[in-house]
Amino acid sequence: MNRFKSLIILLLLLSVAAGASAQKHGFGAPNLTGYDSKIYHFGFSLGAGTYNYIISTNPDLSTLDGCDSLRVVNPHAGKSFGFGIVSDVRLGKYFDLRFIPSFSFPDCQIQYFCNTDVPNISYANGGANGIVFLDLPLLLKFKSTRMMNNVRAYVVAGAQYSFNLVYSKAKDIANQSAHEVLLVNAHDIMAQVGVGFDFYCTYFKLSTEFKFSLGMMNQLQQEGKYIGAINSLRSKGFQFSITFE
């Protein structure tokens, strides 16, 4: 957790430093004057945030075989971080198309709260426990004109396909375990929307962005006594990222 906090602080410090650098010359000559006329831009992205599930449970848990001890099932948000390569195509004065293949490492838990005579249960998914995503987002970016010469505001929207690179290993662990193991789908499709700022520095452009993602697919894959208490499982996440282009 300390490493995660350190990463968040580092990203914030980098964005503040870049913003200060861009605004230092904000009322003077603009930086990177020929940048916006280029058709293609490339760079890299670093991000951190939270990952969680939206759970739809059985309306009456007591009606399920073997589940009469359950009281409630709750998701518990976990941290997430990732990195990727930025590919940007200029579509017009105010629009860009962005493709940012990335690796992400989300972590989260699903907690089962039982009656007092039955111990509570937690299923963990993430990192070595079962999720390392290859993310393939395709986003449309709408940007404003330059403000103070070296700053732009923008919004992005689009969709992302994600594939769990360690799904086979997680499935083997689930099949060999003597206990129930929560196994989520290897594939996910997420709708995404975000807002951010572009800062034109002396030698590069830095962008800061907040983005929300919502899964469109049911991630629950197998059945079981306690897993059967869940009707559907969809992912959601918030991410703060910085990109260098």
Predicted regions and their residues:
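Cleavable N-terminal export/targeting peptides
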Residues: 1-36
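Predominantly the C-terminal beta-signal and adjacent terminal strand-loop region
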Residues: 186-191, 196-245
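Gram-negative (and chloroplast) outer-membrane scaffold detector with strong preference
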Residues: 25-40, 48-54, 86-168, 241-245
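Extracellular/periplasm-exposed beta-strand and loop segments of Gram-negative cell-envelope proteins
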Residues: 52-78, 106-134, 162-188, 218-237
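Interfacial helix-start motif at the membrane-water boundary
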Residues: 79-84
